[in-house]
């Protein structure tokens, strides 16, 4: 199960803990780009010990050794190399045939095209124009060798749903989501290309009220989404989460 330590990932972790009586039976995967916020790494180390997580940390060391980074490359290239390729490497190394992900349809128009069970080919690519229909609880879950399926239980949750669940269950999350000095992060990614929003929302109640009044995109602060037309769709077609 990919785990970014963001709010959606932590909700999915919490649901897994509840489903399996406090012990997640499958490994969690953190794709470490080496550009993580220090607060996220601190949270990762705390949560791994606190919940007894079997954590796999994957870095695309080959790309980093070639100098791939935000200092020298555009954000779409870096995202593909350090996130998508690293994910493909992890899937191949561990021979996984399924991933449980925390993506949601309301995050981005491209994710709105997704399915609860989303097949990926042997290159982890997503053929969004040729997805199998999913009617009356019938899901496509059989894979050919080398392929995998992405299981996406939060697909129909909204951003406010996520926050209300965090509030109800008192789920620990990184403090970067809460306002400090008039700014907070609404969505978390690599620190060089993730920008905070103007906000005074310092509590979950404040955040929910803020979201109920806003019309701006949740991922407006994520630079790779806006680098070129249809950037997110191109990234996801190649295997990005």
For each feature predicted by the language model, list its residue ranges.
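Nucleotide-activated chemistry modules centered on ATP-dependent adenylation/adenylyltransferase
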Residues: 1-2, 7-241
């Amino acid at each position: 199960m990919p785990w970014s330590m963001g709010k959606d990932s932590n909700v999915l972790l919490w649901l897994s803990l509840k489903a399996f009586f406090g012990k997640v039976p499958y490994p969690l995967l953190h794709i470490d780009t080496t550009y993580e916020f220090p607060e996220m790494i601190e949270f990762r180390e705390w949560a791994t010990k606190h919940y007894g997580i079997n954590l796999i940390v994957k870095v695309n060391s080959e790309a980093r050794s070639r100098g791939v980074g935000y200092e020298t490359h555009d954000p779409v290239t870096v995202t593909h190399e350090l996130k998508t390729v690293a994910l493909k490497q992890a899937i191949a190394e561990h021979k996984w045939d399924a991933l449980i992900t925390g993506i949601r349809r309301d995050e981005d128009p491209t994710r709105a095209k997704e399915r609860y069970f989303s097949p990926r080919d042997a290159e982890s690519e997503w053929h969004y124009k040729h997805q199998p229909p999913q009617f009356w609880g019938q899901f496509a879950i059989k894979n050919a060798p080398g392929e995998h399926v992405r299981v996406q239980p939060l697909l129909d949750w909204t951003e406010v749903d996520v926050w209300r669940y965090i509030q109800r269950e008192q789920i620990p999350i990184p403090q970067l989501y809460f306002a400090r000095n008039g700014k907070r992060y609404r969505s978390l990614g690599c620190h060089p290309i993730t920008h905070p929003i103007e906000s005074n929302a310092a509590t979950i109640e404040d955040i929910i009220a803020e979201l109920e009044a806003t019309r701006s995109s949740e991922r407006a602060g994520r630079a790779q989404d806006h680098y070129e037309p249809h950037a997110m769709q191109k990234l996801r077609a190649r295997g990005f989460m």
